[in-house]
Design a protein with these regions (language model features):
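Juxtamembrane intracellular "pre-TM" segments in multi-pass secondary transporters
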Residues: 1, 194-222
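Helix-loop boundary and gating motifs at the non-cytosolic
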Residues: 1-53, 216-257
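Multi-pass alpha-helical transporter architecture, strongest
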Residues: 18, 85-90, 180-192, 367, ...
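Loop-to-transmembrane helix entry/capping segments in MFS-fold secondary transporters
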Residues: 37-38, 130-142, 249, 333-343
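Helix-to-loop junctions at the C-terminal end of transmembrane segments
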Residues: 54-67, 161, 266-278, 362-363
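Structural signature of the two symmetry-related core transmembrane helices
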Residues: 70-86, 281-295, 375
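Intracellular juxtamembrane helix-capping segments at the cytosolic ends
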Residues: 115-130, 318-331
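C-terminal transmembrane helical hairpin of 12-TM major facilitator-type secondary transporters
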Residues: 280-320
Length: 400
């Protein structure tokens, strides 16, 4: 089996597992377990902070990791720790007390160190395992397949919730998550690594200081930070919708279904359109689409929420796929490891900030104002990435 097929398989399996122990499902479970909305926001912030800490370390070490495939496969297992704790609470809800809350926070912190490791190395792994000319299409197709699989699982989860006990079904899917992480780790470890030959010039470019000499590293700090603020708010939309009584524990499960549909549709759209429209044009188009639809999510009732959120999610996942691809067009391949650490460090740190400011921002301008703030931040990101990519392309053209 080719590495591209294995890449699609392990990313699909990993994303299915990730779906059922994070995001809307995690938020709903925690609220059902007795966590307050503020505790959920704080937990999300902690998880992002631990990712940031690991990314900070990888800024200096990612280029020195020799066994990228092996370390990546091990990092797949990190979320098993947190999911086991979730499973214990779902199997025996009566045992959930203050000690359980503390256990969730501790294991979440530990698990998200591993998630931070996986986040960075997943961008480095393709350089060691595939032909990078296939990277754009492979990214779109693999993400679409992962979204389709996660959609089917999320749909099954939502349908089962309407017929059986919430905690019973949720505990079953926590078990599925654990199995998915183990299997994805095995598939990743089975990939064949290319022999990487590095000459003296490439070694100099691969020096961790080289990325700090690249002016685009600093210019892109701004859009990476503003995107993090926007996505940080986007990621807790289920909690926001429950807090405003638009959704409840049953209807909130459909948020996850929407996300998986949007993942599939957005990534398939990107995979077949990015060469015709160019990555930067797709990014700008998706940014405008998300900015128009997202602020309306809380204003039109339940049906309006699902409609606007579906559209916003579609464009959000086009953006999520476009940015890693456009980065390969802006940043030299020798600097991609350290740069990705910096990019994800800023992006994830901003997500942590976002979950901390939601409560005071809501007190000042209401939840609709919070969504408008997220929209403005996303717009800044899209416009700046477009401008930098256009500038780099023109610069390369002038050199020729």
């Amino acid at each position: 089996m080719s590495n591209i097929k294995k890449y699609c398989i392990f990313t699909t399996i990993y994303n299915v597992g990730f779906t059922f122990c994070t995001g809307a499902i995690m938020q709903t479970f925690l609220i059902q377990a007795g966590f307050s909305a503020e505790q959920v926001y704080l937990l999300n912030s902690l998880m992002q902070i631990m990712q940031v800490a690991m990314m900070l370390v990888l800024t200096f070490l990612s280029g020195k990791i020799k066994r990228v495939k092996t370390v990546t496969s091990i990092s797949h297992l990190s979320l098993c720790i947190l999911t086991v704790v979730f499973l214990m609470g779902a199997i025996n809800p009566e045992s959930i007390k203050r000690g359980y809350v503390i256990a969730v926070f501790i294991t979440a912190g530990i698990s998200y160190v591993g998630v931070g490791l996986y986040t960075i190395l997943s961008y480095c792994l393709p350089y060691y395992t595939i032909d990078m000319k296939d990277y754009g299409k492979m990214t779109g197709v693999s993400a679409a397949i992962a979204g389709g699989a996660s959609f089917l699982m999320s749909l099954a989860y939502s349908l089962l919730l309407s017929k059986f006990s919430y905690m019973k079904i949720t505990s079953t899917f926590f078990i599925i998550s654990i199995l998915c992480f183990i299997l994805s780790s095995i598939v990743c470890a089975s990939m064949r690594e290319k022999i990487m030959e590095t000459n003296e010039e490439e070694r100099e470019k691969n020096d961790v200081t080289a990325v700090f000499k690249n002016k685009n590293t600093y210019i892109l700090l701004i859009p990476n930070f503003t995107r993090g603020l926007s996505i940080g708010i986007f990621n807790v939309i289920a909690t926001i919708a429950i807090s405003t009584s638009i959704l409840n524990e049953t209807t909130s499960s459909y948020v996850n279904v929407i996300l998986q549909i949007a993942t599939f549709a957005g990534n398939m759209f990107f995979a077949f359109a990015y060469k015709k429209l160019s990555t930067k044009n797709l990014l700008l188009f998706a940014t405008i689409g998300a900015c128009v639809s997202f602020p309306l999510s809380l204003e039109l009732g339940v049906a309006g929420f699902f409609c606007c959120f579906t559209v916003a999610s579609f464009f959000r996942f086009v953006i999520d796929t476009a940015i890693p691809v456009i980065v390969t067009e802006i940043i030299p391949k020798e600097q991609i490891g350290p740069y990705t650490s910096i990019r994800m460090l800023v992006f994830t740190g901003a997500q942590a900030v976002a979950t901390l400011i939601i409560t005071p921002l809501n007190a000042a301008v209401g939840y609709t104002g919070v969504l408008i703030f997220a929209t403005v931040m996303l717009f800044i990101c899209g416009v700046m990435y477009y401008a930098v990519a256009k500038s780099v392309k023109q610069s390369i053209g002038n050199q020729k």
